[in-house]
Amino acid sequence: MVDTKTPGDKTLTMPTKTLTLKPRVEQGVVRQSFSHGRSKQVVVEKRGKRRLGGDEPAAPAAPEVAKKPAPAPAAPPRQQQSRPAPQQSRSGMVLRTLTEDERTARATALADARVREIEERKQAEIEAQRRAEQEKIEKAEREAAEARRKAEEERHRQEDEAKRKAETEAKKRFGDAEPAKKPAETSTTTTTAAPARPATTTTRTPTPAGRPPAVAAEAGDDDEAPRMIRRPGGPARPAPPPKQPAAKPGASKQRGRLTVVTALNADDVRERSIASFRRRTQRLKGHASNEPKEKLVREVVIPEVIAIQELANRMSERAVDVIRLLMKQGAMHKITDVIDADTAQLIAEELGHTVKRVAASDVEEGLFDVVDDSTDTEPRSPVVTVMGHVDHGKTSLLDALRHANVVSGEAGGITQHIGAYQVTSPESGKKITFIDTPGHAAFTAMRARGAKVTDIVVLVVAADDGVMPQTIEAINHAKAAGVPIIVAINKIDKPDAKPDRVRTDLLQHNVQVESMGGDVVDVEVSAKNKINLDKLLEMIALQAEILELKTNTQRPAEGTVIEAKLDRGRGPVATVLVQRGTLRVGDIIVAGAEMGRVRALISDQGETVQEAGPSVPVEVLGFNGPPEAGDRLAVVENEARARQITDYRAHQKREKSAASVSGMRGSLEQMMTQLKTSGRKEFPLIVKADVQGSLEAILGSLEKLGTDEVAARILHAGVGGISESDVTLAEGFNAVILGFSVRANKEAAAAAKRNGIEIRYYNIIYDLVDDIKKAMSGLLAPTLRETMLGNAQILEIFNISKVGKVAGCRVTDGTVERGANVRLIRDNVVVHEGKLSTLKRFKDEVKEVVAGQECGMAFENYTDMRAGDIIECYRVETIQRSL
């Protein structure tokens, strides 16, 4: 296109002749020669590089371009013709004049282009300067390499010269012919090899037409033999091959269409297989597979004790390395040895791992979560524990509230089991849970357990009896649990009832009732005549409203085992008070060292229920074994977690029992030493009871009976009937079997009768404790008491044949009896203790001599008596002791 740049003419014309561009390409044919006489011709195109500006390399192409008709000189004539005849170019466009904005934009673009050009020129100058510096550095490196090469060649030349001189010297000295032949052969070979080089060079000189010399040289170098270099004054030696850059893995395995590079390198003629390439890679790598691998850093979980093998496995290390580190610390171990957590942590940290310490007790974490009171929105029934002294009417009061008769079912009319019941208040209709506890001294643990799970304590005090020891203990339990107390003064229907005396006695123990100006509620009741029972329930309900008891029934159940027993028909049965959540049939539960799945829930009325909410007492069936009374019950998500917890607790229980047994029994030497020094005797017993609470009370009472001289040794204690294994155990230790509210089965009774094992049955704990106390008292060593009889003074010593020396004495006070024990005192020092063998008055043997009379005395096996000695006569009495 040609712009006339005439303001008046707005037409643009196109030249009629077509413009063409000649491709700047030079073609040639390259002939390639291969082994076995094969050859190949390849067409090679050489494309010229377009040069910008007036560069010098573009000058040779100028003649060719000049031969073509240039469109630039022809343009002015066309423009001149088009001006007078604008009608010929009918296809032209009418152009408008440029506006001011367009001119400004064009000027701005031109200015930007100039600035960009200046910047590019500066950048090119910087690049050229950097390239010049780089070439200078490379040139210096080449010169240094050349100097090193020349020094190396000089050194080799001197070595060869020294070797040749040594060979010449050896030939002169020994005159051998063979050493002379070898240099001749060497020189012949050198001479032959010397002209070989020009021939080879002559062969390589002609190159195919159009092929660059460099390409021909490369092709020739592949087929030629190694070149020999001959220096003046030295033998010919092969020249070192030129250093080539190391080929990258996979570079020799190029496939695809034919290009200039592939044609020159002849890669498409003979290619290496994949297996060959792999073998080459392995050879290049060498022993890279034996290099140390990257170290893995792990988080190692370390329990309280861990075996070395297990520690090595958790760290992914070799056990040998772990043992080596332990040896450096001065400890010799085997792979199966167990080390403590501190040592294991040192080893793991030294090997670069991170350590997470865990304890065996961590399995119990999260079992009893901290209760979030914000979720407790539903009201629950209060739990009321009835406490007081024995025979103050606790169970009778509860029977009157429940309209039941529990007292008649207890042996001896005293409560020996803990019971839980629910009563509906007649006034408000709300349910109240009552827990009945034993009152006598043996059941302290039961009372403490009842106080821990309760909200309110009802302290029952008999109006005719007043405050008693167990009443004081119940007050202390309630204060320790931090629960409010309601005093129920019972038996006000008796004629000798004194309620005011009870209130006054309670003041001594910091229990101040409302009538005395305090804040403790007191109610006068009569369980026998059912007086003021509704008022007692009303006070309990009022106290419960003040406490604002709330719960969340949707959370997993938690509770406390109040009582546990082994029922012959139903298996292990536990009385559980649910404290939080809801316990349902099918839940997996854990209590102490026992676990199980809830098979059935039985209410206090004997009815089977499907679930039990908060503050509801139920009997739970489904435990693997009877749990301990007082254990906390929890619902877990699966059997694996339950088994993990119970295994840990059972292990702890075994360790504790083993420690107590070993501490009590010790080794054989310790037992013998103990018998020699203290003479402590043991009374072996096997105790079986109906429920866990009674067993606990019996064991506590028997433990209190022990003294420094005699103690009860409990070989086995359990819940359930007496079995044949119990009899076998008793036979081995010659023990007595005690059954409390249980009986022996047929096989156990027959085995006991056959082996002579005594089995005693009891229904009242007092009788059991009294009998054991008497039996243990029989093991006590009796007490020896000395009773003075009289004194006698020796007047004269007589020698009598066939008898020996006889002392003539006068009894000064008391009496002297034959056969009694005597002491011989000389100068207020006892010189002999023995027995009186002879007592005569005149010539007759007498039984005793009274004060003021004279007699003759002789001692058993002692004759050194002198006149003036004092004889003291006394009698030793044996008195049986009791606990």
Curated annotation (Swiss-Prot):
Record-level GO cellular component terms: cytosol
Organism ancestry: Bacteria, Pseudomonadati, Pseudomonadota, Alphaproteobacteria, Hyphomicrobiales
Compositionally biased spans, kind Pro residues: 235-244
Region (G5) location: 526-528
HAMAP family the UniProt entry points to: IF_2_B
Region described as Disordered: 1-259
Residues involved in GTP binding: 388-395, 436-440, 490-493
Comp. bias intervals (Basic and acidic residues): 113-184
Any matching Pfam family: EF-G_D2
Name assigned to this protein: Translation initiation factor IF-2
